Amino acid sequence: MMIIATICFSLISVMVKFLGHLPVMEITFFRNIPTMLIIPLILKNKKISFFGNNKTLLLLRSLLSGFSAIANFYTITVMILTDAITIKQLSPFFIILLASVFLGEKIDFKKITIFILAFLGALLVVKPGFRLDIYPTAIALLGAMLTAGSHVTTRSLRLTDHPIVIVNYYGYTNGLISFGILLWQGNFILPDALSLFVLLLLGLVGLVGQFSLTKAYQMAPAKLVSFYLYLQIIFGALLGELLFKEIPDLFSIFGASLIIISGYLNYKLEN
């Protein structure tokens, strides 16, 4: 399930990059339309409660996921695709810390060492001091932390709520929030036919990705499942070069390699 989710999220990154001429809130709103239309029908057919059981945690998870998506969409539109995805992949290490605090999953010195290795890799990608504009990088790091929080809450919800309910909360909460902000900003751009097709496809792929991610975290420990997120770096590098002619520099390549290696080492420790 996590491999399916990873493929979906990689495709989402490419589509968001393509849609970079549109406002981020507009992209976010369209991302949630299929979820808001399809999921309620599935819930009704399966006779599952629309509002779920753990409403507070469901809402918290939706807000964390939604704002992490907004941060991710923004950084994808203004940064090299591989760099944006690589920084986002620090989220598994935040997951380790949060899972230790809130879920009681063990953490030891080896994991701390691996975390430091990943952090060094992130520094090579970010290259602090090499450029003046650090705002996109800060947003990317914030997005990684929010992503970690959403994944940990997803793991916590496994005992109380159905995966479809979790996805439904995500779609409605963030669809309504992004629509409200879009109205407030007043910068809606009417998409052309191709952009509209990509926007709708983005929503469908996002729906599959969210469901697969939620199901994966209900089936396995957060630390183990999060390893597969690193595949996005590889997919992002390949797709960024093929579709957008974006070639990461040596610092980014080496930094991404360190993050992937540290993710693999963490995976081996868990097994």
What are these regions (language model features)?
Residues 22-35, 74-91, 133-146, 192-206, ...:
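Structural signature of hydrophobic alpha-helical transmembrane segments
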Residues 6-10, 40, 62, 66-70, ...:
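Hydrophobic/small/kink-forming positions within alpha-helical transmembrane segments
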Residues 1-7, 36-60, 109, 159-161, ...:
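Membrane-interface interhelical linkers
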Residues 11, 47-82, 88, 204-220:
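Specific transmembrane alpha-helical segments of multi-pass solute transporters/efflux pumps
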Residues 110-126, 251-270:
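Hydrophobic transmembrane alpha-helices of multi-pass small-molecule transport proteins
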Residues 1-26, 132-156:
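Glycine-/small-residue-enriched transmembrane alpha-helix faces in small-molecule transporters
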Residues 74, 91-113, 234-253:
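C-terminal transmembrane-helix exit sites in multi-pass transporters
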Residues 30, 84-90, 157, 161-173, ...:
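Helix-helix packing/entry segments at the starts of transmembrane helices
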